[in-house]
Regions:
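Pyridoxal 5′-phosphate
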Residues: 1-178
Length: 178
């Protein structure tokens, strides 16, 4: 959601929020973690030990060029968010209408209204996602949900929203942007 929609971490009671620069057209390999310091239970245990960089959470030399690039990407996304929001919704909806008009058995996963503007996840009855990916090599898309892309098992996220194993294995995910 960072860089795609406006939200307020206080209003939404967010204690932890991780995000990465490449999702905002910034450099790969750099990310950020928001921790709500006002919540005494929102603590992060050390996983790596060494220097006191990054608030003593992670040792290592800071990648200053990537950090600066990340900051610039956030700045640009903040300025262009409304325009990008409208553009990505338009692209997503046109693409979906085209898919539905040319394929039978297409079902959206989740709601078309209550989703990120740049995301489209659906399945086609009777067509496994891995087979569809082989047939449509000219398109860049993923199977399943973002957190289980590339897995041969049904996505636990898609199953949690009520899909069967077959439907989850038939699901594909498209992302839209500038």
């Amino acid at each position: 959601a960072v860089g795609k929609i406006k939200f307020d971490v206080s209003e939404m009671n967010i204690d932890f929020l991780s995000f990465t620069a490449h999702k905002l057209y910034g450099p790969k390999g750099i990310g950020a973690l928001y921790i709500n310091n006002n919540n005494p239970k929102a603590k992060l245990a050390k996983r790596l030990f060494g220097g006191s960089q990054e608030g003593s959470i992670k040792p290592g030399t800071l990648n200053v060029p990537a950090i600066v690039g990340f900051g610039k990407a956030i700045e640009i996304c903040s300025q262009d968010m409304a325009k990008d929001f409208d553009l990505t919704i338009s692209l997503r909806d046109k693409f979906y209408k085209n898919i539905v008009s040319n394929l039978n058995g297409v079902s959206i996963n989740g709601s078309m209204k209550d989703r990120l503007p740049n995301n489209l996840n659906f399945f086609v009855d009777g067509v496994r996602a891995d087979k569809l990916m082989l047939e449509l090599r000219d398109l860049a898309f993923s199977n399943s949900s973002a957190c289980s892309s590339g897995s041969t098992k049904p996505s636990r996220i898609l199953k949690a929203i009520g899909l069967t194993d077959v439907q989850a294995l038939s699901s594909v995910r498209f992302g839209f942007g500038r």
